[in-house]
Structure formats: C-alpha cells, structure tokens
Amino acid sequence: MSIATEIIGVPETLDHFQSESYSPYHFFSSEQWAKFRADTPLTLTSDEVKRLRSMGDPIDLDEVRRIYLSLSRLLSAHVESSQMLFEQRNRFLSLSDVTKTPFVIGIAGSVAVGKSTTARILKELLGRWPSSPKVDLVTTDGFLHPNAVLQREKLMQRKGFPESYDTGAILRFLSAIKAGRPDVKAPSYSHLVYDVLPDEYKIVDRPDILIFEGINVLQSRDLPAGGKIVPMVSDFFDFSIYIDAAEDEIHNWYVTRFMRLRETAFRDPNSYFHRYASISDAEALEIAEDLWANINLKNLRQNILPTRPRADLILKKGKDHLIEQVALRKL
C-alpha cells in the first residue's frame, strides 16, 4: 500500500497522488526524486557507504545517488533559508554578535527500518558541503532510563516505548542545544550491554547541524490535567524525516537481523544477549518472533506509525530495503 493511501486514503497511482490538491504531501518515485540532485556532487566512496550502513541494510553508492544527494540538496536549501531568516531577524531586532543556534533534523521510524544508516549517511554528506558545516549526530538510546530503573518500574518489556525514555532529559538537552549553549552532554548507550553507560557522555559543542535520531522523536503528548503546556521533542526540530516500510517487511528485517546477530555480536561474552548465541535456530527464531509480536510490533502500531504524518519528509522503503517512494510536505 502506498504512503498516500495509508495516510489520507487517496487512490494508489502516482499520477493521481500528484493531482490530489487535498494531500499535504508531494509524492515522487525514487526515479523522479533522483532528478532533483542537479549538480550536487557525490562525496562518499563505496567503501565509506559500506562502513556507514547497519547490518542487513543493502544501501550502496547507487542508492546514495538516487535518494540521498537530492535530500542533501533539499536540506542545504532549508539550512540556507534558516540562515537568511536568522540574519533578517537580527536586522529587524537590531541585534549584533548573535550566534545562530543549530539547525536540528529529527529522524524517526521503526526498529530495523534503517534510521541509523540514514542518519550516518546524512551526517557525512552534510558535513562535506562546500561550507563545511559542523554536523553532530545524537540518538535517543542514551536517554532511555537505565535497566535498573526499568526493572524496578516493571518496564523492561516496554523498553523503547515512550514511557521508557527520560523525556525530561531529552527536552533539557534539546533546549540547551537550541539556546546555543556550549558543551552540552548527551548520555551514551551500549547496544552490547543493552544499557545506558553511567558517567559516559557525548559532548555536543554548538554544531551548525544536529541530527537527532530515534523511534519516537515525533511523538506527541497529551495535555496535562492541570493545563500546563509541555513542549514536545519535535518542537525543537527544523526538519523531520520518517523512515517508512510495510509492516511485514519490517518484521522480516527485524527477525533476519536478530538471527544474524547470533553469529556476531551475541557471541561476545559481554553481550546482554549472549545467552541467545548458543540456543538452536528454532529456539532463536521463536524468541525473535515473540520479541517482534509482543514488543516491537505493538510499539510500531501504537506509538511510532501514528507519528508518520507529522514528518516533513517520508522515505518509503520496498522489499529490498531500498527507498522506492518519497513524500515531501507542501509549503
């Protein structure tokens, strides 16, 4: 099913998408999108793309050419427009010696859909613009509550759900970033030990661009009973991207990745999941299916997928894990 059909119920053909005046998005096939690259140079090598991609993600240099160079050009236009508005506002307010705050890009989407690959590719491409901007990447993993807290609150089976994150810490971090503060600390997370690393931080020092990646970064919040207005994480974004795919495809990618990890990371004795390395394939498959059905699928349906229409750009992947359709919000 197409993005447009799922979001607003319009017919499936691409030609019809683009004629629908009530759609909030422009829709493009990957071939159409690739043409917007114009003269944007390819600044990555094949070996670099292989290094940047996550396990099971087949992205290659051709995919970078087809999708990411046009996206890099689009983001360059948004950053440039933001800079122009900043300068005009300073003139309006008669301000001088004011430093522009970082342009923040949010990237959301399900587990196993390829958010991390997209974030890393964009970080490299954006950092190689002629203007040589300073680009930082932070994920929400470090803002999860420590396992000890999740266990105490009986939330280990809800890890990755909105309530498993220290949302206050996320908001304080992004507030500091947008205030232009130097040396802002982002907590670190280890996928090996499956936990936040105490007293370990990434220092974010006034980048030109910050990429903030996580499954629930577009999540909205209910208004508190007392009526006090609470900001949402996405309030701090200048541009947002949602990585999309059919539910069945994400399921397949998740299970395949889990089985591959048994042959790699899970074999490390320090791995939280080391116990899964020595069980049979049948047992491992059953565990992977259970984790998908009872945790990740529920999170996708209840919390992640409903945020998709809030994105400025939706990248829809096909069965081969490559992007086949792009939806860009109209201005």
From Swiss-Prot:
The keyword Transferase applies. ATP binds at G109, S110, V111, A112, V113, G114, K115, S116. Its EC number is 2.7.1.33. GO terms for molecular function: ATP binding; pantothenate kinase activity. Keywords: ATP-binding, Coenzyme A biosynthesis, Cytoplasm, Kinase, Nucleotide-binding, Transferase. It catalyses: (R)-pantothenate + ATP = (R)-4'-phosphopantothenate + ADP + H(+). GO terms for biological process: coenzyme A biosynthetic process. Pathway: Cofactor biosynthesis; coenzyme A biosynthesis; CoA from (R)-pantothenate: step 1/5. It is found in: Cytoplasm. Gene3D superfamilies: P-loop containing nucleotide triphosphate hydrolases. Coiled coil: none annotated. Transmembrane segments: none annotated. One of its GO terms (cellular component) is cytoplasm. Disulfide bonds: none annotated. Belongs to the prokaryotic pantothenate kinase family. This is Pantothenate kinase. It comes from Rhizobium johnstonii (strain DSM 114642 / LMG 32736 / 3841).
